[in-house]
Amino acid sequence: KNDFIRNRKLNFMNLVLFILQRGKSSLQRELEKFFASVERGKEITASALTHARKKLCPEVFISLNNALVESFYNTANSISTSGIRRILAVDGSRLELPNNEEVVEEFGRANKQPDAKPLGIVSALFDVVNKVVLDSSINPADASENHLAFYHVGRARQGDLVILDRGYKCLWLMLGIVQKGADYLIRLPVNAFKEVELFEKSNEMEAIVTLHPTAKVIQQCMDLGIEAVPLRVRLV
């Protein structure tokens, strides 16, 4: 908590600004370009930057993104929407990470082989119309994408439509979205629920069915503070 309180050459604001706008040149070259534009005469070495960066709490970027998102929706004069709601999408992907001991300890490897590459899961909630990332995270390789989606939905608001792919087929997640005040659209595999299988065999164009939580789903709901109740859904 005592970092960045003294008047150093590389203060908190300059460090954050540099990280956010760093280009593709060498680290030292980027430092020279940056300080030539913001504070002429200052000389910061790459090693000094590395030392300062280790002291920077990564949560600062989460706070900055949250503030930026709130500012955008509060002040933008021409926010694009679809009717009266935002169209949000959740998706995740596996990401190969740098191969060093600290990264492996934090995120794990692609498999149990000792020479397997470090792997993480990135996940995000994205406003597809306005092209704004509302929430994102990078997580260990064994993280549950469904749980990550649930945490992202905490950034959704009343009336939002959340779009999810076939990997997010769990009932407790649907309940969590609805109880946050948002709606959802999910591409379900046929074998996701028996009601979906029956609908697919019926040759009907659409149907309203009720999904009932199993004992396992009820426990998952309890763990996450979700009310485990039957859910009426429209299949098309």
Where in the sequence are the language-model features?
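Single, function-defining residue in the core of a domain
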Residues: K1-S25, E30, G41-E43, L49-L56, ...
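Residues within the helices of the helix-turn-helix
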Residues: E32, A36
